[in-house]
Curated annotation (Swiss-Prot):
Matching PROSITE patterns: AA_TRNA_LIGASE_II_ALA
GO cellular component terms listed in the entry, alphabetical order: cytosol
Enzymatic class: ligase
Catalytic activity: tRNA(Ala) + L-alanine + ATP = L-alanyl-tRNA(Ala) + AMP + diphosphate
Protein name: Alanine--tRNA ligase
Pfam families reported for this sequence: DHHA1, tRNA-synt_2c, tRNA_SAD
An example molecular function term from Gene Ontology annotations: aminoacyl-tRNA deacylase activity
Ligand binding (Zn(2+)): H567, H571, C669, H673
Organism for this UniProt entry: Streptococcus pyogenes serotype M28 (strain MGAS6180)
Cofactor(s), names only, from the UniProt record: Zn(2+)
Free-text remark on how the cofactor is bound: Binds 1 zinc ion per subunit.
Protein role: Catalyzes the attachment of alanine to tRNA(Ala) in a two-step reaction: alanine is first activated by ATP to form Ala-AMP and then transferred to the acceptor end of tRNA(Ala). Also edits incorrectly charged Ser-tRNA(Ala) and Gly-tRNA(Ala) via its editing domain.
Length: 872
């Protein structure tokens, strides 16, 4: 077996499959594009779903890739096992309706065992297969595999909801008896026992059925096109080929671990407790790549995942004695390891470091809050005489504050408390079940549509015309091809068309189809791309249509021009964002409608009003500069030399279309555009908002809609000016400010009067001191305007030694407000209010020194006050 670096393994994989006629698919962005079913790209096949479900036909049905991926369903196991990772690299080879089982197995065996390639020893390889899949068994035998090395496994059948499915065969490497201390042998494979002896290095999925959850597996229908989908983890291959005990001792992780050694002063011991080193090395890889691909830490979705990873890594850094910000210092090492295939980490190093460091600094403050929460929980346990920290509280520390369970356990045990591990596991399982349920709901590969995939007739979109005559090539009605249709809805393909099919954020054209008499025979309501790329017109049929007949196709010209104004303005906006807030502000999505444009982009904070003003001004300057818009068809490399921006997630063919707006903007774009920027007329931003972690959205209008927006603002300003009696519009702001200042002064004066009144009233309330169980207390009903006044009472009470406990009740409107304050450790205000609040049909809680509650039964106030003596 050859000893290869990870870069050599990756390249040899790609070279082998290229020699078998495969094209190399570049690694896609970790953030899925146009796929709401995925939080992250989580496998090599995830980016190829459109090919497997038949919605798009690839130029070459043989594909290979090395795809960066993220999976986060087992974060807590990262660092504990030899093979769990959040970010990993999946090597794959795929056949879309081309070769199948025989070639997949034979070529796979050749790659693994040939001296020209990986040169694995054959006697170290074992294969599992689905028991009913005798063809795979026989093919392995034909390759020279001993029957004793073939293990039937009932679970070797791949399916995730509706869509492509089929048996799979897995390949394992036997690391020998040193990794099998109990000498269990092949039972480890046959009974799926977790072990470090047999390492799964490759899975070959034989996708031959359309899975249907409504029927038994035996009734699944054969796919129109059988497919091959395989995946081999680079990290595992590297561990085996480099003789590493775990994935972490390979050249993918050790350089990071060496840097952590320098930062911590600790030494990594492969045979010792090295979990913290592994967690840090794994998580900084995921963070570096995900942030480089446009995801940013946040409180939801993928942003929450990144925040959780970063906080877990920071806490493990503290366990190694690293108390200052340090993760950002590891980003260059990650970039250097992966540079040969993924140069983007080093290219975006400054931005990634900035985000990681800022998040570390924020978490340093959060740790203090989390420590305070834990201290409060432990104090409450002491007050209640309990000795165990509940699982739900441990989970909250873990989930909300990023505290690893080990740290909570350590701090709690130091304070003399036990840990409710089972309760924590239960809370964790509930979260995982919710996550898995979400995958089941949205993780299907999608059903293949044989009718659409079978359209092979050529069709060409004509950019520079609004109307043309063309022959009708295909009619599909009720999901079947037909020669004619006279009513209902149908899908049509023409030899050529002026109708733009929805793509790249630009909506489809609408319009009409006329016969040779000039009568409208169909209304075009939508246009989408067919699997083979033809514009597929969805029409409402008004009169007879037949294949082979010529028709006149007319688009709605006014609508197209309005859409083009917004699309061209989107290109200007994209360039302006780069200039004003930074080149990291790349497109994350767009929509160019008739009435408005919507542009989503990566950015880590709200765009300030001043920045929005600059962006809006810059776009309008380019409109007024009357820049000529040109389009050029060329190859991708030439386009990039021209400075064209290629968008994440977009797949470009051999010939691409470059849209250039003067010297200001150059982008790869297949959409339609104006001839000159001046045709936009006017550009106005109407909204800027966050739509998720690290993603902002700008909504803007152009032309007539922009003018209407300005006029509406002016009308509103005139109304405000009239209300505040400003002599001119320019004086309105000063008038409003003066009124605001006056209101603030009055509110301040009112608050001071309330405070004086409360202080005066407090003198009477605080005189009535009672005693029970050795505790001095005051219990009184007070007449106040709001709950804030109760806190003012409590603040005044704290200033002097009136009593040990204060209980105040106020009927405010239809609600009863209760406050309990305590100066003594013998009375926990939060616990006391939990006993008192139900008397007035309420509930509440709080800290040991202060608690509040709300109720609804004012008739029981006297009963509550009488109960205070029993509850202190």
């Amino acid at each position: 077996m050859k000893e290869l670096s990870s870069a050599q393994i990756r390249q040899m994989w790609l070279d082998f499959w290229k020699s078998k006629g495969h094209c190399v698919e570049p690694s896609a962005n970790l953030v899925p594009v146009n796929d709401p079913t995925l939080l992250w790209i989580n496998s090599g096949v995830a980016t190829l779903k459109k090919y497997f479900d038949g919605s798009v036909i690839p130029e070459n049905p043989r594909i290979t890739n090395a795809q960066k991926s993220i999976r986060t369903n087992d974060i807590e196991n990262v660092g504990k096992t030899a093979r769990h990772h959040t970010m990993f690299e999946m090597l794959g080879n795929f056949s879309i309706g081309d070769y199948f089982r025989d070639e997949a197995i034979e070529w796979g065996f050749e790659l693994l065992t040939s001296p020209d390639w990986f040169d694995f020893p054959k006697d170290k390889l074992y294969m599992t297969y689905y028991p009913d899949d005798k063809d795979s068994y026989n093919r392995w035998i034909a390759c020279g595999v001993e029957p004793s090395h073939l293990v039937p496994i009932e679970d070797n059948f791949w399916e995730i909801g509706a869509g492509p499915s089929g048996p799979d065969t897995e390949i394992f490497f036997d690391r020998g008896e040193d990794f099998d201390p109990e000498n269990i042998g092949l039972r480890l494979l046959a009974e799926d026992i977790e072990n470090d002896r047999y390492i799964e290095i490759w899975n070959i999925v034989l996708s031959q059925f359309n899975a249907d959850p409504a029927v038994p597996r035996s009734e699944y229908k054969e796919l129109p096109n059988k497919n091959i989908d395989t995946g081999a983890g680079l990290e595992r291959l590297a561990a085996v080929m480099q003789g590493a005990k775990t994935n972490f001792e390979t050249d993918l992780f050790m350089p990071i671990i060496r840097e952590v050694e320098k930062l911590s002063g600790k030494t990594y011991n492969p045979d010792g407790d090295n979990m913290s080193f592994k967690v840090i090395a794994d998580h900084i890889r995921a963070l570096s790549f995900a942030i480089g691909d446009g995801a940013l830490p946040g409180n939801e979705g993928r942003g929450y995942v990144l925040r959780r990873l970063l906080r877990r890594a920071v806490m493990h850094g503290r366990r190694l004695g690293i108390n200052e910000t340090f993760l950002y210092k590891l980003v260059p090492t990650v970039g250097q390891i992966m540079e040969s295939y993924y140069p983007e980490v080093l290219e975006k190093r400054d931005f990634i470091e900035k985000i990681v460091k800022r998040e570390e600094e924020t978490f340093a403050r959060t740790i203090d809050a989390g420590s305070g929460h834990l201290d409060s929980l432990l104090a409450q346990l002491k007050a209640e005489g309990k000795d165990t920290l509940e699982g739900k509280d441990i989970f909250k520390l873990y989930d909300t504050y990023g505290f690893p369970v080990e740290l909570t356990e350590e701090l709690a045990e130091d304070a003399g408390y036990k840990i409710d591990h089972e309760g924590f596991k239960s809370a964790m399982k509930e979260q995982q079940d919710r996550a898995r349920a979400a995958v089941v709901k949205g993780g299907s590969m999608g059903m293949q549509n044989e009718t659409l995939a079978g359209i092979v007739e050529e069709s060409r979109f004509e950019y520079d015309t609004y109307s043309l005559e063309s022959s009708l090539s295909v009619i599909i009605a009720d999901n079947e091809r037909t020669e004619a249709v006279s009513e209902g809805q149908a899908l049509l393909v023409f030899a050529q068309t002026p109708f733009y099919a929805e793509m790249g954020g630009q909506v489809a054209d609408t319009g009409r189809i006329k016969n040779d008499k000039g009568d409208t025979v169909a209304e075009v309501v939508d246009v989408q791309k067919a699997p083979n790329g033809q514009p597929l017109h969805t029409v409402n049929v008004l009169a007879s249509l037949s294949v082979g007949t010529n028709y006149t196709l007319e688009i709605n010209k006014e609508r197209r021009l309005a859409v083009e104004k917004n699309h061209t303005a989107t290109h200007l906006l994209h360039a302006a964002l780069h200039n004003v807030i930074g080149e990291h502000a790349t497109q994350a999505g767009s929509l160019n409608e008739e009435e408005f444009l919507r542009f989503d982009f990566t950015h880590f904070e709200a765009v300030s009003n001043e920045e929005l003003r600059h962006i809006e001004q810059e776009v309008n300057e380019q409109i007024w500069n009357a820049l000529t818009i040109t389009t050029t068809e060329t190859d991708v490399e030439t386009a990039k030399e021209m400075g064209a921006m290629a968008l994440f997630g977009e797949k470009y063919g051999k010939v691409v279309r470059v849209v250039q707006i003067g010297n200001y903007s150059v982008e790869l774009c297949g959409g339609t555009h104006l001839n000159n920027s001046s045709e936009i007329g006017l550009f106005k931003i109407v909204k800027e908002e966050g739509i998720g972690s690290g993603t902002r959205r700008i909504i803007a209008v152009t032309g007539r809609q922009a003018f209407e927006a300005y006029r509406n603002q002016e009308d509103a300003l005139k109304e405000i000016a009239a209300t505040v009696k400003a002599p001119q519009l320019k004086d309105a702001a000063a008038k409003v400010q003066a009124l605001s200042d006056s209101l603030r002064d009055l509110q301040k004066e009112n608050a001071e009067l309330k405070e004086k009144a409360a202080a005066a009233a407090a003198g009477d309330v605080f005189k009535d001191v009672q005693e029970a169980k050795g505790v001095r207390f005051i219990a009184s009903q007070v007449d106040v305007a709001d709950a804030g006044a109760l806190r003012t009472f409590a603040d005044n009470w704290k200033q002097k030694d009136y009593s040990d406990v204060l209980v105040l009740v106020a009927a405010i409107g239809e609600k009863v407000n209760v406050l309990v304050a305590s100066k003594t450790k013998d009375v926990h205000a939060g616990n006391m209010i939990k006993e008192l609040a139900p008397i007035v049909a309420g509930r509440g809680g709080g800290k040991p020194d202060m608690a509040m509650a709300g109720g609804s039964d004012a008739s029981k106030i006297a009963e509550l006050l009488a109960a205070v003596a029993e509850t202190v």
